[in-house]
From Swiss-Prot:
It is found in: Cell inner membrane. Keywords: Cell inner membrane, Cell membrane, Lipid A biosynthesis, Lipid biosynthesis, Lipid metabolism, Lipopolysaccharide biosynthesis, Membrane, Transmembrane, Transmembrane helix, Transport. It comes from Photorhabdus laumondii subsp. laumondii (strain DSM 15139 / CIP 105565 / TT01). Belongs to the ArnE family. The chain crosses the membrane at residues 37-57, 62-82, 91-111. It is a multi-pass membrane protein. GO terms for molecular function: carbohydrate derivative transmembrane transporter activity. Pathway: Bacterial outer membrane biogenesis; lipopolysaccharide biosynthesis. This is Probable 4-amino-4-deoxy-L-arabinose-phosphoundecaprenol flippase subunit ArnE. One of its GO terms (biological process) is lipid A biosynthetic process. Disulfide bonds: none annotated. Heterodimer of ArnE and ArnF. The keyword Disulfide bond does not apply.
Length: 113
């Protein structure tokens, strides 16, 4: 149970870091005055991703790499959903089908655990 909680925390931190990167790029494309805020978003991204990596190293002490790394694919699901809800990004049927297959794979791996 602790490994699943840790994996979920890592995924949330990584997803948040990716969203900060996206926000930084969007600020950078704006006018010159908003470029300073892009740096703040980038710093936030680095911090979130670094903390996620520290928890990842802890998770690798608990789970084998062959189990932990594929289960990290939950990030694809989180980032896809976040892109849709926060940035109104479009994803086609093939993309959503891939997300469903990832979810099935994660389910199968967690049943083996």
């Amino acid at each position: 149970m602790i490994s699943f909680s840790l994996l979920l925390l890592i995924s949330l931190l990584t997803c948040a870091g990716q969203l900060c990167q996206k926000q930084a790029v969007m600020c950078w494309r704006s006018d010159v005055y908003q470029r300073a805020s892009a740096l703040k978003w980038l710093i936030g991204a680095v911090i979130l991703l670094a903390v996620g990596m520290l928890f990842w190293l802890r998770l690798l002490q608990i789970l084998p790499l062959g189990i932990a790394y594929p289960m990290l694919s939950i990030n694809f699901i989180m980032v896809t959903l976040a892109g849709k809800f926060f940035y109104q990004e479009k994803a086609g049927i093939k993309h959503w089908s891939g997300v469903v297959f990832i979810m099935l794979g994660i389910l199968l791996m967690s049943l083996n655990e």
